[in-house]
């Protein structure tokens, strides 16, 4: 995909940690480009998706060190490959946001043991046992990684 669209792909989230559950966890990727429209068209063609599958969104990054909230505009889609049990969440941003977004993602690469353990416990409840609905799973996961661990509230 990277060769086709002519842009590097950056992985983040659980795919880079031990709380990734193959075939169950989604894979999060970021793509940074100077020309979002062209990149989105290439992704649509490569993934055989419609333009309407890509939604514009606002990503808010709160930085405690300088108390400035950064608002980033991007595009997001979810690609599902049922044949390979693969779900990929793709975000496309303008190149000017690359540094701030990658720094925010890097803050969640090396989580403390207690956070990782709790995330794995949540995933077992959600993926394996099916007793934790997606809404509560997502909410609790966001609270744990954003409020209890690092100082970002994105």
Give residue ranges: language-model regions.
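Acidic Asp/Glu-based divalent-cation binding sites
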Residues: 26-28
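Short gly/ser-rich loop at a beta-strand->alpha-helix junction or flexible surface loop bordering the NTP-binding
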Residues: 6-16
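Short, conserved beta-strand segments within well-ordered enzyme catalytic domains
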Residues: 10, 30-32
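Catalytic core of pol beta-like nucleotidyltransferases
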Residues: 1-2, 16-24, 33-154
